[in-house]
A protein has these predicted regions:
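Flexible, solvent-exposed loop/hinge segments and secondary-structure transition points
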Residues: 2-174
Length: 174
């Protein structure tokens, strides 16, 4: 009986020590990870809407209305996570950055940042998070793919596998 109690005490002590160490490591790395993520997001914002001098997050975003808008356009598994206003030096809004999460990624969620000028021109897209398979899936994060969206002003993009022939067509990954 003493041996069982002794072993239980040793295992409990090891578990408590490991838990405390894990908590300390989490506490030490939490802020640097959050800062790195915020910096990465700011870099993506600047990349997709380079004319903006500053960005202001829209705090009162109606996520339900945004989800309905996406669903009505055939994007039922996507969600708008964040919208930021891109402002020039005088504080005027010159465009928007929209962060969208697609839940249809093969390797997990795909987070995309899209920059749109006030006149509706897509200035660029940037992948915030993508965990697709090496090769085909990761082609979405190449400049060749992302540059197809740059400076396009269309109502809706069409995807083609035969090569983009018009302004509203994007060469699909295949």
């Amino acid at each position: 009986m003493n041996k069982i109690v002794k072993n239980a005490f040793i295992l409990t002590a090891i578990t408590v020590i490991a838990g405390l160490l894990l908590g300390v490591v989490y506490g030490v790395t939490k802020e640097p990870i959050a800062n790195a993520k915020a910096n990465s997001k700011q870099e993506a914002f600047q990349s997709v809407l380079s004319d903006a001098d500053s960005f202001e997050t829209v705090d009162d975003l109606d996520t339900d209305a945004a989800s309905e808008l996406l669903k009505s356009n055939g994007y039922s598994s996507d969600a708008i996570e964040e919208v930021a206003l891109g402002k020039d030096k005088s504080g005027e809004t010159i465009g928007y950055v929209i962060n969208v999460v697609s839940h249809e990624g093969y390797g997990g969620d795909i987070e995309i940042s899209v920059g749109i000028q006030a006149d509706g021109t897509v200035k660029g897209i940037e992948m915030l998070s993508i965990s697709e398979t090496a090769g085909l899936g990761m082609k979405a994060d190449t400049d060749d793919f992302k540059n197809q969206f740059r400076d396009k002003k269309v109502e809706k993009f069409q995807y083609t596998k035969t090569g983009a022939a018009s302004e509203d067509e994007i060469d699909a990954i295949s």
